[in-house]
Amino acid sequence: MISEINGNQILGLETFPSFLKTKYKTNISLDSKNNNVFFITSSGELYSINYYSNNINWLSNIFPRNSSGSELFYSSPIVNRNDKIYFSSSVSTYSINTNNGSINWELPFSTNLRPIVTDQFVFLASEEGFIINIDNATGKVIWSKSLYKEKSKPKRNKVGDIISILLVSDQILATTTKGYFLFIDYKTGKLLNYTKASKSGFYSSPVIVDQKIYTIDNKLRILIFN
């Protein structure tokens, strides 16, 4: 940890080293209410640290114990909500109790895309176009859809891989590598519509501000949609 005042190191933590080169970065989530920070290393170690006391609250290893060590571990960004953290990894998708690190539920579904988390649901998507709606409390699958498998759906080679999902009102907005918006009914997973939003593709994931969608394309232009 680095002081924002003078740039000096406040805390250094040595984690288990990984000898594999990977494009995936360590994911970090801040809990400012309880002064905690959560992060996952590329070796599959999940840490909870209090950044005021500089103490480790708990440590959990979510990489399979029977792994040979040669497999690539990755995780999605961490979502922190109501004393739980949610993330997907190369192993499974998890809901974790932030107080003690215990697993609330685990689902054998892997993705590196950030999940959507509400009080009732957790939505997951893979790059290949597979969408899942999960009950937040139990981890049970409510519905699942494969967007690119049905004949009436857009083809993956046309619209590209999914790179992000966002809940917009009563729809899931998915963005793709080839600059498409996909609009999905959150209740059923049905694809409602899709449109080409950027010719160059997306540089950033979209955000919602004042009922408008903002994103940055690969030419570093800010795009705004109603």
Annotate each language-model stretch with its function.
Residues 125-133, 140, 145-186:
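Loop/turn-rich, solvent-exposed surfaces of beta-rich toroidal or solenoidal domains
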Residues 171, 176-220, 226:
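C-terminal closing repeat unit and adjoining cap/tail of repeat-based domains
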